[in-house]
């Protein structure tokens, strides 16, 4: 009786788990998205997000064949980390053919996922959640897992920000300081893979890049300091995701596309606003500059 009265009086309270999940994904997406844009590995992130369908399909097939019940997110994370390490090795060893090899991993990963999914007896509703996102159905166990991964990503970023900063702007400088470029690059890609899986729960595989890239692109128009870009990106992610959830709930729209549209409108608006700094002001995506932290 009391719970129904509270739901009727404050309908948005039932969305509290959804807002918490969006908050965690927004923070991780804003922070890691900054490294991704500055390092110019957006295409790598896109290939991971789409090729991860292979890990999802394999996980669902194993669940069906062995009659197991476990969180599909774990299979997605294992697949994402494996793909990140493969792509990292490709980047470091075959840079001249990086684009073609990334496209190969992108398409092959999706093909493997589709093959495994086709072997399932019935269509699995969780697949739609991974493709298009369905944060409205987040469970307490989902929140715990997202919280753990969020703390893991942010903790490593706090400890290793200086190394990541040097890696993003000058790999040779990192090597000259007796730091393993391969180690730090792999770690950056692994954190990116974990963040991608977190964002998939909010936006889905198809629309995830809008939450990872567009807020950073907007922030780069108003600042060139990495920490400030991260802060602005996190705020934009929170604003767009919370607004998108409320709009989707009120208008009965899907949440992921609603958030993606808000991100796109925000980026379009930023293009129309006069830049606060002189056009000659260096941007963090320019590899030749020595940026402030």
UniProtKB/Swiss-Prot annotation:
Alphabetical GO biological process terms: response to zinc ion; transmembrane transport
A GO term from the CC aspect: ATP-binding cassette (ABC) transporter complex
Function: Part of an ATP-driven transport system CPn_0541/CPn_0542/CPn_0543 for a metal.
Stated family: Belongs to the ABC-3 integral membrane protein family.
Cellular compartment(s): Cell inner membrane
Signal peptide region: none
Protein name: Probable metal transport system membrane protein CPn_0543/CP_0209/CPj0543/CpB0565
Keywords: Cell inner membrane, Cell membrane, Membrane, Transmembrane, Transmembrane helix, Transport
Topology of this chain in the membrane: Multi-pass membrane protein
TM stretches of this protein: 12-32, 41-61, 68-88, 101-121, 140-160, 183-203, 253-273
């Amino acid at each position: 009786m009391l719970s129904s009265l509270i739901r009727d009086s404050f309908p948005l309270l039932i969305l509290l788990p959804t807002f918490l999940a969006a908050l965690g994904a927004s923070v991780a997406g804003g922070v890691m998205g900054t490294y991704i844009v500055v390092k110019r590995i957006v295409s790598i992130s896109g290939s991971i997000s789409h090729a991860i369908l292979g890990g999802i399909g394999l996980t669902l097939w194993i669940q069906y064949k062995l009659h197991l019940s476990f969180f599909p997110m774990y299979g997605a994370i294992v697949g994402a980390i494996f793909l990140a390490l493969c792509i990292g090795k490709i980047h470091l060893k075959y840079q001249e053919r990086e684009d073609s090899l990334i496209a190969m991993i992108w398409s092959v990963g999706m093909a493997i996922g589709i093959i495994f999914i086709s072997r399932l007896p019935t269509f699995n509703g969780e697949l739609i959640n991974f493709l298009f996102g369905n944060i409205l159905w987040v469970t307490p166990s989902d929140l715990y897992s997202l919280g753990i991964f969020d703390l893991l990503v942010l903790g490593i970023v706090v400890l290793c920000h200086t190394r990541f900063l040097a890696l993003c702007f000058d790999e040779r400088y990192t090597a000259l300081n007796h730091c393993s470029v391969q180690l730090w690059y792999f770690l950056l890609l692994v954190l990116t893979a974990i963040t991608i899986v977190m964002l998939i729960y909010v936006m889905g595989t198809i629309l995830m890049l809008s939450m990872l890239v567009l807020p950073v692109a907007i922030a780069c128009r108003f600042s060139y300091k990495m920490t400030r870009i991260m802060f602005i990106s996190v705020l934009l992610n929170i604003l767009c995701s919370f607004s998108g959830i409320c709009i989707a709930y009120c208008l009965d729209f899907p949440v992921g596309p609603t958030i993606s549209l808000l991100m796109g409108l925000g980026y379009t608006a930023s293009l129309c606003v006069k830049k606060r700094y002189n056009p000659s002001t260096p941007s963090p995506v320019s590899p030749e500059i020595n940026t402030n932290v």
